[in-house]
């Protein structure tokens, strides 16, 4: 079995394992860059992602997978210029083993985990906006990571974000059309009832019964309440207040 046939078989069996690396598998020869080519790869680093079929021969083949911390880079390995980036720009000189190891550790994965670290929102999450929209860069301020939320850029930025006329006004709580009588009635319903003075006829009947007995009975209370158009509670309260008033006047108590 040659290398090209083995590559096609790998792509057909494991299409998800190759992804964007399928373009490298058309030539039939192994294609790996200096950074992607490890010197020794163990089975534990590849097994979480896919397994090899049983009919693989000794021919050459190309595959794409994620490597874990189990790869090893020799001490004397030297990477050519342009393979790795340093501070956002291509390096003009070869990169030694120490610098490459520090960069590779930043993009390493947990051993035995099939996915990478969760993405943390930071400054790089903000998309690039035109200079005319952002204004002068000297007046821009740095954004912190705390409370950062991804902005939905699917909508057009030129559309109006806020319109005062679209806002619905809240209904007025106080209506000026209410009359003073309605306001007074509502206040009396919520709080204490308005005091209504007794009429002369009511006071005459109450005083006559009080002169007869200072403690009214149940039958007399019902009779006076029905004759004076008062409630039994009002009659009882009037007798209580009348007795308190007599106690405050000593001369009346002596005569009694």
From Swiss-Prot:
Subcellular location: Nucleus
Molecular function GO labels: DNA-binding transcription factor activity, RNA polymerase II-specific; RNA polymerase II cis-regulatory region sequence-specific DNA binding
InterPro entries reported for this sequence: AP_axis_regulatory_Homeobox, HD, Homeobox_CS, Homeodomain-like_sf
Cellular-component GO terms for this entry: nucleus
DNA-binding region(s) in UniProt: 191-250
A GO BP annotation: regulation of transcription by RNA polymerase II
Source species, domain of life: Eukaryota
Alphabetic keyword roster: Developmental protein, DNA-binding, Homeobox, Nucleus, Transcription, Transcription regulation
Gene3D superfamilies according to UniProt: Homeodomain-like
Disulfide-linked positions: none
Recorded family membership: Belongs to the Abd-B homeobox family.
Annotated function: Sequence-specific transcription factor which is part of a developmental regulatory system that provides cells with specific positional identities on the anterior-posterior axis.
Protein name as catalogued: Homeobox protein Hox-D13a
Source organism of this protein record: Danio rerio
Lineage of the species this protein comes from: Eukaryota, Metazoa, Chordata, Craniata, Vertebrata
């Amino acid at each position: 079995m040659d290398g090209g046939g083995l590559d096609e078989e790998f792509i057909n069996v494991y299409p998800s394992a190759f992804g964007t690396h399928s373009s490298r598998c058309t030539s039939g020869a192994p294609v790996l860059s200096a950074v992607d080519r490890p010197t020794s790869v163990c089975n534990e680093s590849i097994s979480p992602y896919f397994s090899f079929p049983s009919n693989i021969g000794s021919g050459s083949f190309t595959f794409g997978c994620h490597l874990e911390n189990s790869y090893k880079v020799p001490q004397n390995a030297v990477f050519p210029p342009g393979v790795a980036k340093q501070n956002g720009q291509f390096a003009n000189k070869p990169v030694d083993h120490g610098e490459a190891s520090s960069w590779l550790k930043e993009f390493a994965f947990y051993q035995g985990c099939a996915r990478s670290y969760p993405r943390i929102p930071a400054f790089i999450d903000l998309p690039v906006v035109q200079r005319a929209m952002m204004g002068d860069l000297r007046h821009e301020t740095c954004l912190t990571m705390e409370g950062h939320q991804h902005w939905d850029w699917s909508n057009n930025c030129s559309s109006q974000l806020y319109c005062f006329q679209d806002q619905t006004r809240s209904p007025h709580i106080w209506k000026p059309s209410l009359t003073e009588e309605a306001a007074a009635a509502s206040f009396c319903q919520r709080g204490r009832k308005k005091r209504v003075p007794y009429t002369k006829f009511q006071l005459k009947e109450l005083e006559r019964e009080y002169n007869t007995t200072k403690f009214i009975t149940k039958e007399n209370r019902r009779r006076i309440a029905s004759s004076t158009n008062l409630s039994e509670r009002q009659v009882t309260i009037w007798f209580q207040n009348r007795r308190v008033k007599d106690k405050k006047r000593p001369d009346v108590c002596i005569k009694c």
